[in-house]
């Protein structure tokens, strides 16, 4: 189960997340296997995903899985950590196409809007889905999910402050409050994107969302 954003992740030159090395070296690409697991977890969530689902998607026997990971929870944590790592790099690259803070925020909005189209949109975002299930996750899993959410919010806060400094974003509102509002808008797009929004609808949503920075 490999979708468009997972292909992009596999081609990204990112540092490998901790893969909890144990025993003899494994004869498969751990990052590539985790990328495939991300698609399953994003679409089904942690609880509805079985080890059999992961074994099939990752194209590994359950024996190979258990040599690399302790259990399903271990795979999930590795998936969230890798998703955070790679998606943060992609998001940072996208926003840097803007010149002002506002233009960078717009680029960030468009980054999420583009992810809402097609198969990626229908599948949803791993972190957004995990946030909705946060109450049902144990402390270890909840911690890595919150870490991914906090990382995105920190980038948004930085861009808001950059915009306020260069005059492209209003100073009437607190920067942290604006960043959290932007985070809610971005994550909300990913949730509603699962219903099959058109590019035109998403474009209109982004246009209206940007008004919070006026």
PLM feature segments, named:
Residues 6, 123, 128, 171-192, ...:
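Hydrophobic alpha-helical segments that form the core
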Residues 10, 32, 36, 40-74, ...:
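Helix-turn-helix
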Residues 1-28, 172-173:
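N-terminal intrinsically disordered/low-complexity leader segments
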Residues 85-88, 103-106, 139-165, 177:
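Amphipathic alpha-helical packing segments from all-alpha helical-bundle domains
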Residues 78, 92-123, 175-182:
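Hydrophobic alpha-helical connector segments
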Residues 115-117, 158, 162, 182-199, ...:
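Amphipathic C-terminal alpha-helical segment
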Residues 26-27, 38, 42-44, 52-53, ...:
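Recognition helices and adjacent regulatory flanks at domain boundaries
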Residues 104, 119-140:
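Amphipathic alpha-helical segments used for helix-helix packing
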